C-alpha cells in the first residue's frame, strides 16, 4: 500500500511540475527590467481587493449539459496554429477567440470587469499596476495547471521571432510594462503608461501553455501547424478531430474549471461541436432544413425571407430569430491595395469610392435590411467621428476624380483610358459566399463611371491567402472588432505596409492586417501618438483625426453595417430569456444555448412523417438595438 501511495504521489507531483523552457528562463534573466520575482510578503499592504461578484449572472440555470451540436464550415482552417502565417483566419473564433480567457472578462451586458482566470484583483494607488490572485483550480484543456509561469511564458512566446507575427511582437513589447510573480497563483502586471481602462487592458493578459511548447523553436510554423494549442476554455481539438477539408470537431473538457464558477457555469453546454465542410451556402441551408444542422446564420434576405415558405418553418419546427446587439461594427467593404499600380494614386481611389454603389446593393440585394457603413471605425461611441460620411455613388464625381489621374479618354467598350493607353481596370475579389451574387451590381455600376471591375471569386481559404500575401487589387473583406477603442496600428500603420530593403526600395509586407498597404507618414504619426496617449480627451481627439485621415486617404470603401445577427434554429436548441447578451456577435460568442437530444429524435421523426408541430414562429429581440 505504501508503494502504491508513493507512486500515486510521485505521479501527482510529476503532473504538477510543468515543463520549464531553459530558453525562456534565460530570457527572463536577460530582461530583469521586465520580469520580476518576489514573495507574498512583498505585496503592498494598502491594496483593496475586488472580485466582481456584484454583477448579474447572465447564463440560464435551466441549461442542460450534453449533446452534439451540428454545424458547417465552408472550409477547414489552413492551420491550427494560433499565431503566425495564415493563423488569423475565419475559423479562429471557434478554435481560440471564443474558447479562451484572460485574467478578467467584461460583463457582456454592463461592460464591467468580472473575474476569469483571476478570482480577485486590486489596482495600485498610482493606477499603473494591477494585482491578480489566480484561480488554483483553472487548467488548460490538456489538463495542465495554469500558474504564474504561464503568464511569464506568454511574453517570451509572443516576443519571439520564431512565431513570425510582428503584431504580437509589437503588442507584447510596447503595451506592457512588466510582470511580477509573488507565488504560483499571485501576479502583478504593470502598464507602460497611464491610459483609460487600465484595469481592463491589463486584465486581457492570457497565459500560454508552456508544457505544450516543449518543442518551441525556429521550426514553430511547421512543428505546430496541425496541432491545436491548449486553451483555458471548455473545448479542444484532438488529432483525429481535425480532418483537413472534411471536418473539425471540438470536444468538451470533462469537469471544466468554469463549470464551478459564477459567470461561466451553465454555458458552453454541448459535449461535442461538429463542423462539417459544406462549401456551398445553398447546400448548408438545405442541410439546415433537413435537420442535419441544428442552427445557422441566415443573414442573406433570400434565406431570411425565403424560410417563410419552407415546410420546416411552416410546420413549426424551425424558428427564425433576429437579434440586435450593441457592438463596434465590423468594417465590411472594399479594401484597395495601394501598393498596386494606379491604385497608389489617391485620385483613382476617390474615383473608386464614387463608382461603387453599395447603397444599391443594400436596397436591392439586402432589401434595405442593412445600413450603409460610413467609415472604418464605427460603433466606438465618443471615439467615433459621426460627421464622416461615406462618399455617395456619382458617375460625375467618379469621372472627375479619374480625370485628375489622367483618365480622360473613353475606349470603344466605355472604359476610360489615359494617354498611355492604360485602361481603368482592376480585379475585384470576393469569396464564394452568397455575397458574390451582387458582384454584377458593382460591376455594372462601375461601368457607368468608365471603370472596369474584373470579378474574381475564390474559395474562402484561397482568398484569405491571396489577400494576406497582398496579391489582390481590391477585395471585399471585414475585420472583427474587439474592444471599444480604435486599434489602427495593425490595419493602417506604415510598419505593417512595407518592408524596406537594403537598397532603399520598398516592397509590400506580407502576412499583416494592413491589407490596403497604406503607408502614410501622417497617419502613422497619429497612430503612434494615440498609442502613447495617457488621457482620454487627447485620445478622443487623436481618434477623430485618424478617422478623418483614413477617410481622406480613401483606401477603404465603406460597405454596410449589420445591426445584429439572424439565425434559424430547430426546436431542440434552447435559448435563455432575452435570447442572448448585448455583446454577442452570434450564439456561440458566449455559449448560452443548450440542446435537448431527445427532442431532436422526436422532432425529426414527426417532421418526416408530416406532423405539424405548431404555427410558424419568428422572434425579434431588439432590447439592445442602437441604430
Predicted segments with their positions:
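Ligand-site clamp/hinge motif
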Residues: 135, 223-226, 256-308, 443-460
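Detector for C-terminal structural segments
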Residues: 18-25, 52-53, 241-248, 332, ...
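N-terminal lobe/hinge region of extracytoplasmic solute-binding protein
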Residues: 36-57, 66-125, 156, 230
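Aromatic- and charge-enriched surface segment that lines or borders ligand/interaction sites
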Residues: 119-164, 188-190, 284-287, 342-344
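Gly/Pro-rich hinge or "lid" segments in bacterial periplasmic/extracellular proteins
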Residues: 88, 94-101, 105-112, 203-267, ...
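Alpha-helical secondary-structure segments
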Residues: 70, 147-154, 184-190, 234, ...
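Extracellular/periplasmic solute-recognition and catalytic clefts
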Residues: 161, 165, 179, 238-249, ...
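Surface-exposed binding/hinge segments that line
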Residues: 64, 168-217, 223-225, 234-241
Amino acid at each position: 500500500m505504501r508503494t502504491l501511495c508513493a507512486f500515486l504521489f510521485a505521479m501527482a507531483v510529476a503532473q504538477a511540475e510543468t515543463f520549464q523552457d531553459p530558453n525562456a528562463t534565460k530570457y527572463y534573466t536577460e530582461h530583469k527590467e521586465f520580469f520580476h520575482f518576489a514573495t507574498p510578503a512583498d505585496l503592498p499592504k494598502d491594496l483593496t481587493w475586488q472580485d466582481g461578484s456584484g454583477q448579474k449572472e447572465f447564463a440560464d440555470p435551466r441549461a442542460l449539459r450534453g449533446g452534439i451540436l451540428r454545424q458547417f464550415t465552408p472550409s477547414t482552417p489552413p492551420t491550427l496554429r494560433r499565431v503566425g502565417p495564415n493563423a488569423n483566419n475565419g475559423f479562429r473564433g471557434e478554435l481560440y477567440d471564443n474558447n479562451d480567457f484572460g485574467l478578467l472578462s467584461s460583463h457582456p451586458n454592463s461592460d464591467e470587469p468580472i473575474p476569469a482566470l483571476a478570482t480577485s484583483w486590486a489596482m495600485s494607488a498610482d493606477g499603473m499596476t494591477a494585482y491578480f490572485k489566480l484561480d488554483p483550480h483553472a487548467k488548460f484543456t490538456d489538463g495542465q495547471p495554469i500558474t504564474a509561469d504561464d503568464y511569464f511564458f506568454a511574453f517570451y512566446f509572443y516576443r519571439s521571432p520564431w512565431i513570425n507575427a510582428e503584431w504580437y511582437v509589437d503588442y507584447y513589447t510596447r503595451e506592457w510594462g512588466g510582470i511580477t510573480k509573488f507565488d504560483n497563483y499571485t501576479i502583478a502586471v504593470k502598464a507602460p503608461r497611464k491610459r483609460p481602462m487600465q484595469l481592463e487592458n491589463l486584465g486581457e493578459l492570457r497565459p500560454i501553455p508552456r508544457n505544450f511548447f516543449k518543442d518551441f523553436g525556429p521550426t514553430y510554423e511547421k512543428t505546430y501547424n496541425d496541432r491545436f494549442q491548449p486553451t483555458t476554455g471548455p473545448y479542444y481539438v484532438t488529432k483525429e478531430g481535425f480532418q483537413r477539408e472534411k471536418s473539425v470537431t471540438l470536444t468538451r473538457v470533462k469537469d471544466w474549471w468554469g463549470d464551478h464558477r459564477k459567470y461561466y457555469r451553465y454555458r458552453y453546454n454541448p459535449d461535442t461541436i461538429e463542423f462539417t465542410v459544406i462549401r456551398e451556402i445553398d447546400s448548408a441551408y438545405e442541410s439546415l432544413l433537413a435537420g442535419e444542422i441544428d442552427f445557422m446564420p441566415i443573414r442573406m434576405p433570400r434565406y431570411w425571407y425565403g424560410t417563410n415558405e419552407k415546410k420546416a418553418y411552416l410546420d413549426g419546427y424551425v424558428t427564425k430569430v433576429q437579434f440586435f446587439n450593441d457592438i463596434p461594427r465590423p468594417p465590411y467593404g472594399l479594401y484597395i491595395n495601394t501598393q498596386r499600380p494606379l491604385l497608389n494614386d489617391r485620385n483613382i481611389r476617390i474615383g473608386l469610392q464614387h463608382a461603387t454603389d453599395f447603397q444599391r446593393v443594400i436596397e436591392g440585394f439586402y432589401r434595405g435590411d442593412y445600413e450603409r457603413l460610413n467609415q472604418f471605425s464605427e460603433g466606438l461611441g465618443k471615439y467615433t467621428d459621426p460627421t464622416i460620411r461615406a462618399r455617395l455613388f456619382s458617375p460625375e464625381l467618379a469621372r472627375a476624380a479619374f480625370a485628375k489621374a489622367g483618365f480622360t479618354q473613353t475606349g470603344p467598350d466605355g472604359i476610360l483610358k489615359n494617354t498611355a493607353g492604360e485602361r481603368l481596370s482592376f480585379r475585384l475579389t470576393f469569396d464564394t459566399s452568397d455575397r458574390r451574387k451582387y458582384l454584377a451590381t458593382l460591376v455594372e455600376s462601375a461601368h457607368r463611371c468608365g471603370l472596369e471591375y474584373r470579378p474574381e471569386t475564390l474559395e474562402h481559404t484561397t482568398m484569405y491567402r491571396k489577400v494576406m500575401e497582398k496579391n489582390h487589387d481590391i477585395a471585399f473583406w471585414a475585420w472583427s472588432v474587439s474592444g471599444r477603442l480604435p486599434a489602427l496600428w495593425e490595419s493602417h500603420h506604415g510598419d505593417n505596409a512595407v518592408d524596406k530593403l537594403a537598397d532603399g526600395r520598398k516592397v509590400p509586407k506580407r502576412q499583416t492586417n494592413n491589407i490596403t498597404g497604406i503607408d502614410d507618414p501622417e497617419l502613422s504619426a497619429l497612430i503612434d501618438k494615440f498609442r502613447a496617449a495617457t488621457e482620454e480627451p487627447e485620445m478622443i481627439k487623436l481618434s477623430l483625426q485618424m478617422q478623418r485621415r483614413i477617410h481622406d486617404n480613401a483606401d477603404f470603401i465603406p460597405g454596410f453595417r449589420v445591426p445584429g445577427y439572424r439565425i434559424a434554429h430547430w426546436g431542440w436548441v434552447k435559448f435563455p430569456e432575452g435570447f442572448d447578451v448585448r455583446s454577442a456577435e452570434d450564439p456561440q460568442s458566449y455559449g448560452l444555448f443548450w440542446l435537448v437530444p431527445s427532442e431532436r429524435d422526436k422532432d425529426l421523426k414527426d417532421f418526416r412523417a408530416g406532423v405539424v408541430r405548431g404555427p410558424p414562429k419568428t422572434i425579434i429581440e431588439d432590447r439592445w438595438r442602437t441604430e
